[in-house]
Amino acid sequence: MSELGVFGLTIPEKYGGLGLEKKAMCIVSEELSRGWIGVGSLGTRSEIAAELILIGGSEAQKEKYLNKIASGEIFPTAVFSEPDIGSDLAHLKTRGKLVDNKYLINGNKTWITHGARADLMTLLVRTNNELTDHKGLSMFLAEKPRETEDEFFPAKGMSGGEINVIGYRGMKEFDIGFDNFEVPSENLLGEEEGKGFVHL
């Protein structure tokens, strides 16, 4: 799929993509899903991450990640939804606290598509505890290792399990827990706190 350009359809050519319109992504995803819906979902993960990086990322972040996403070297996933919050992202509870040059992430996420397979998480957390609405949120480009034969989440500070679904073979969903999971400060999208909801 990466050789066909599926993961970089709308990424600009200067970052290794094909530079096509959103319509192309929709058509390709629909056609792949017609054969196997789980495969059709793969390109959309890359689409979400690339869009966030293009909209809000620094030039250094664009250069670091977009080429690798377009080539399929990096497989990203969106880590937004939470238990009891669902898609009401303005009120999410997962926290990120800056300590020295890294953020410590604590909290829980759910319904994370391809969570164990991914190398990179677009991770939405609350970095300002004094704000309880969308203004206190920040987006991170959080790197992690892929699953192993023994563990879904071998990274220090991560745990979780698969959510069994009916009828959507191949598109695996996960619960993820963070316990002082470390993200370098330079992986804050756009290198500015409080812009997470704007990026969405």
Locations of regions flagged by a protein language model:
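A glycine-rich, basic-preceded beta-loop-alpha segment at the flavin cofactor/substrate interface
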Residues: 24, 146-162, 172-200
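A short core secondary-structure module
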Residues: 102, 106-157
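Internal helix-loop-helix
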Residues: 3-73, 114-120, 131-132
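A structural signal for short hydrophobic beta-strand segments in well-ordered beta-sheet cores
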Residues: 94-96
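Structural signature of FAD isoalloxazine-binding scaffolds in flavoprotein oxidoreductases
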Residues: 19-29, 88-92, 177, 183
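Short Gly/Pro-enriched turn/cap motifs at secondary-structure boundaries
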Residues: 42, 69, 84-87, 111-114, ...
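A short, Trp-centered hydrophobic/proline-enriched beta-strand micro-motif
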Residues: 72-80, 124
